[in-house]
Amino acid sequence: MDDIITLKNILSNDDVNWFLDAMDSIKDPQDRAGSNKLYVPRGELGKQVKLRVIEKIHSLYPDKNIHTVNFYDIVKPYGMHSDTVKFTMQGIIPLEFIDGSAYTLIYHQTSDTNIELVPEDKPEDYKPFFNKGVRDPSTIEGWTPGYKISEKDGQKYWQDKWHYYKEAYKGFSIKHSYEWKIGDIFLFHTKYLHSATCSQSRKKGIMFCLN
């Protein structure tokens, strides 16, 4: 089976609205990267969210369950990282985005450990999320020196911040670009490094991992 999959238009408007209502019902979001918010569904709500997600992907993964699921509201795009808690499939469900086009980028480079790519000019008090640590990019599988992302793609995905990301992501190459469409479910293997882009001002969605 492919390790990057898009299930197009698999969610109805009612499905999307149910998820948005579920997200809004969570009154204790966690702060992430300043203005970003993470909403964790617990108890009966968590069970219902997992059930509704797994129903949509059951035909692809009949023997899998949801290991982790949460909602997020992002205004500051997450940089390149991996979520390799375990080798499995990770999913993204777009729920809403404001202006522009939202993308999730999958890179050719992979990792067998949880990492976050942090530039050398990071602030002294910077602490990577989820204790992923700072990694020398040359230790990442598939990384090689040189610029791999085209100027055209750089301007498209990072816009006026491309001059910064061009250097930060030097040596990395884009394997797949998923453009957010409400109604889709996007899945990819957790081994891949991935990132958001600077092409929209805000987006809401669901992230889940299978066990």
Residue ranges and their predicted role:
Residues V75-K191, T197-N211:
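Catalytic core of non-heme Fe(II) oxygenases with the double-stranded beta-helix
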